[in-house]
Amino acid sequence: MKMETFLVCLFHNAKGLHQQIQEILYLLRMHIYETNLYLKQELSQLIYPNRQLSFVLLMPLSLLRNWDDIEYLTDIVDDKQTLHYAANLLTNYVLHLSMYQKLTKQYFLLAVKRVSEKLNKKQQHSFYEVLVTSEALNNYENLPKNILNTLMFAVRYVFNPTPNYSEILAELKKKNKIHHIIFNMVITDFQQIREQQMCKHLCETNNELRQECKEIIFDLKVVGNV
């Protein structure tokens, strides 16, 4: 399962998180056809103390499975750091879903709105600064138009309101290269978390996992630059 390899790679050296990843993925595989209530009861036992890890794992997987009650996952998260991280991760997963044509707008929009509402109440600065200042803007080839449009939809809801929305939207459309920018935002958050929890990012040193990460993240050749 490539999702496992990717997650283990990202969280490898965070204390105690490797086992959490395995437990959550096991529950998802074993009980994916059970009722949502049963899933919530099982998964809620893993939410604390690693709330952030549980959220970032469950949110994208729940989107892929089209769960009806994504609200449960967003309701348990209130701290600013996790909301910041979740907003970035949600945007990144729009790329994943749209690439494989699995994006169901109503499910995605529900999750994005829930995170965005909380996020906008807790912090005022715009994430767009990360987007427009990224050196990666000029490094990669253009995305197909339909995927770009899907991502623009995501950006519109995740990062609204923002003071410079019109200017930055125009900049993104002009560049037409949003995939690596979104990924860069996620990596920025990984760097912040790494300063607090991680000794070293496994992808920096392990060539085999780095290659698999490249394949997972749509072969954009970004992971090697992390």
Swiss-Prot record:
Inducing stimuli: Expressed in the intermediate phase of the viral replicative cycle (immediately after DNA replication).
Glycoprotein found in the keyword field: yes
A biological process from GO: symbiont-mediated suppression of host NF-kappaB cascade
Keyword list, A-Z: Glycoprotein, Host-virus interaction, Inhibition of host NF-kappa-B by virus, Signal
Segment forming the signal sequence: 1-16
The UniProt record lists the keyword Cell division: no
Residues bearing attached sugar chains per UniProt: 164
Family statement: Belongs to the asfivirus I226R family.
Its biological purpose: Plays a role in the inhibition of host NF-kappa-B and IRF3 signaling pathways. Mechanistically, promotes the degradation of host IKBKG through enhancing its ubiquitination leading to inhibition of both pathways.
Protein name from the UniProt record: Late protein I226R
Organism: African swine fever virus (isolate Tick/Malawi/Lil 20-1/1983)
